[in-house]
Amino acid sequence: MGSRGSFVDIDKGDFTFVEGGQTFRKVAMVDDVVVLERFEGGVKAPDYSHSADRIYAVIQTQKAKNKKTGEYETVTRLKQLAFYDKNHDQKISVDFGHPHTGVRPHIHIDRIHDKNVPGIPPTKEQLELANKIIRRLKLDAY
């Protein structure tokens, strides 16, 4: 799976990958959702999808402190759901990793990440899809 901006020329419809630009790995499918894993760095869904009208779920395995025991443990969590349009462009992303103006999870529209815009909670359908992915893949809660 290509990284952000790793396609040859999206303006000309060339969605082949740039050499060395693959930073996501497809790990599963849940219904029509492609589940990708990012192994290092920040977790943001790709700006563009390889397929039109696609939904990606991005997960990441990392060390996290257990709130009850204080010990660090390995957890795998859903970090983002990303929805793409017919032009392969990301239209909505649901961010589970951190709060935005106090709202967690929250959505971003058209890849706009403006700290001055109030956080928008995900829809009921988006949360149901996230919870289905978490259940099916036995992920840790977000």
Describe the residue ranges of each PLM region.
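Catalytic toxin/effector domains delivered as secreted proteins or via bacterial secretion systems
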Residues: F7-Y142
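Non-Sec secretion/translocation targeting segments of pathogen effectors
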Residues: M1-R4
